[in-house]
Each structure stands twice: as structure tokens, then as C-alpha cells.
Amino acid sequence: MTDLPRLPFDNPDIMGIAPQMLALQKEGPIARVGTAGEDAWLVTRYDEVRTLLADRRLRLSNPNPQPSAKSAARAFMVALMAGDDHETEPARHAQMRSLLIPRFSTRRLRLMKTRIEHHVDELLDQLAASAPPVDLHRVLSFRLPTMVVCDLLGVPLADRERFGQWARGTFDQSDNEHSANTFQQVVDYMLELVARKRVEPGDDILSELIAEKDGALSDADIAHLGNAVLLFGYETTIVRIDLGTLLLLRNPVQRAQLAEDPGLAPAAVEEILRLGVGGKGSNALIPRYAHGDITVGETVIRTGDAVMLAIGAANYDDRAFPDGGLFDLTRVRPRSHLAFGHGARHCIGRTLARIELTAVFERLFRRLPDLRLAVPEESLRWQEHRITGGFDEIPVTF
């Protein structure tokens, strides 16, 4: 029986970092904790988390040959990475990035920005035309990233609603069998879509991948890359739109400044990305395994040890961000937050995510200056059973 602190920590607030996490951060950069699967090292301070994110000795796969306990989140990530072979993981990851990074070209992002702004205007029209209370999550937060990822992949309009529902179901870990089944539906659909694109290519990522290397990539390879685009760049943006709205509703003075000056939207987005943690912080922990001994302060992480990188806590660290828990649009040259990771695993879609969030928050409170929650904030439900967390609804009025 262990008496270690056990993740996830209770959090009385629906947003922000659990008090126990912050207490451990004050004590030191690293602590031993229990998890649902196995004991792990929890790293909470900014400098140490940033350093370890760039350390190639920390990987998703376990270097030990015996089966290891996996959290639901890690099991899903391993499945998406197509295996748990620690010897081939670096090469597979490098290949995936080399194929996907060119897909987010300046030309594509410029075109996507125009489309995204059009989508946001349409969705805000629908929101404004609805009789309150209306679910902002359903009308805006869920639909915009669905539209964007479907534009990227060339998903036909007729398929977009079910495609979005499958993607959501994949992240729901309350029923592992259901999650696995919906993930398989996504895989099957992606294979079907790739086959269609071979016959009728378009201006989308899948069509570009089909033409890559003179058509040498298999349908399975291309579908796998399409799944990565969908599942890594979709759900997290949904969550950030919800959290960003709530953060601004909590900060009326800065919300009013943003409504008056949409040029503040990029600064607002960076603070939303930095502080956007909800529930028990399940959406702000990165699980890894050590593939070599690593020293953190006076602690040695041994080969095979599980490590949890607390990017949420790191982004609240007062050592990196003075008054780190405060939402502040006027931060002067703030340090780079870790919401998109760092190093070799720095998020490929970070520029696109920023475009989406900026389009939302330079418009939302200008269009609906009286926007407010229609229910007490404490009644909102954070979905701990989802890999990325998130809310099931955000009822608002205006």
C-alpha cells in the first residue's frame, strides 16, 4: 500500500490548477505520485518541464519489454502512433512530422484564415439568432474545429456531422469498448476517403499525401496521418474555446478591453492557451517513459520510470510568469508557454490553432457584448472521462 499523493488531484475550481499540484510545485520541481496505472514522477516547474519536453530520452513507449500499465490516455496515444515499439518510435515520429509539416504551409494557412473567419461569422450569426439560453459549446466551440479539420482533410459536407461525432466518441474513455469502436469507424472512414481522393483529388491534405513521393505512400499510411491531423488538432481547440470564454467572463475589465480593441485578441489567445486548464487538470499532463537515466535537481529518473509532465502547472509557475495564476492581456514579453509542447514534439498545428482562437476572440464579445453564463459557473460539468477533458455544454444568454 502506497501513501503517495495520487493523481488526479481534487480541484474545487472547475478551472485552474489543483491546490495539491501547486503545493508540490512549491516544494520542488519533481515528486513521486501514484496514478491509476503505476507510480510516476510528476514534474511541475516550468524550467524542468520545458527541458524534459525537449529531452529525447523521454518517449511515449516503454523501454521495458514486459507489459506496462497504461492510463486510458496513454493507451489511446500508443494506438494512434501505431504501436508500442520503443526501438522504432523515434523514426516513426520523425517520419510523421516530416510528412505533415509541409501540409501546414503559409499558402494553406492564409487560405484557411479566410475560411475560418467566415465560419466564425456564420456561427456567431447562428448564436445571435438563437433564443437564449443557448449552448455556446454546441453552436460554436464544437462546430468550428469540426469545420476546420474537415476543410483540411477534404471531408464532404454531407459527412461532416457524423465525422465530428465519431471523433468526439473516440476521446470518451468512460466506455473503452465504445471508444475503440468509434475510433475504428474513424479509421474505416478515413481509408474510404483516401480511396475517393485517389480518384477525385482536391485541395486538401489527403490529396497532397497521395501525391507525395510519387504516390508511394499506402492508403493505410495516408489514413493514419489523416487520423493524426484529426485527433491531435481538433478536440483540444474545442476545449480552448470553451475555457477561453469562461476565462474572459471571469475577467470583465479585460473582456471589455478586448471587445473595444480586437487587436488585443492575440494576447488574449496566449493567456487562454497558458491558463486553459480545467477540472482536475487531466488535459494538462503529458505521460512519458524514460529511455535512460535523467537527473532532475537531486532526483534521478531511472530507465523505464513513468513520468508525467505537468504543462498546466508549469504554465502557472510564478518563476516563469509573475503572478502566474492571473489572466493578464498586458504581460510584457512573457516567456513562451508550453501549451503546444516544446522541442521535437512541438505541436505542428499550433499556428492553425492560434488562427482559430484569434478569429473567435476578436469577434465574440464585440458581437455579443452582453454575453454571460445562463447558469452558475459551478454547475458546469468538466468531463474527466475524456482524454482532453472539456465541458459537455456552456449555456449562455445575452
UniProtKB/Swiss-Prot annotation:
PROSITE patterns in alphabetical order: CYTOCHROME_P450 (PS00086)
Pathway annotation: Antibiotic biosynthesis; pentalenolactone biosynthesis
Disruption phenotype: Accumulation of the precursor pentalenolactone F and lack of production of pentalenolactone.
Iron among keywords: yes
MF terms (GO), sorted A to Z: heme binding; iron ion binding; monooxygenase activity; oxidoreductase activity, acting on paired donors, with incorporation or reduction of molecular oxygen; oxidoreductase activity, acting on the CH-CH group of donors, iron-sulfur protein as acceptor
Keywords: Antibiotic biosynthesis, Heme, Iron, Metal-binding, Monooxygenase, Oxidoreductase
Coiled-coil segments: none
Binding site for heme: C347
Cofactor: heme
GO biological process, one term: pentalenolactone biosynthetic process
InterPro entries for this protein: Cyt_P450, Cyt_P450_B, Cyt_P450_CS, Cyt_P450_sf, PentlenlactSyn
Keyword Metal-binding recorded: yes
Protein family (similarity comment): Belongs to the cytochrome P450 family.
Functional description taken from the UniProt entry: Catalyzes the final step in the biosynthesis of the sesquiterpenoid antibiotic pentalenolactone by mediating the oxidative rearrangement of pentalenolactone F to pentalenolactone.
Descriptive protein name: Pentalenolactone synthase
Gene expressing this chain: pntM
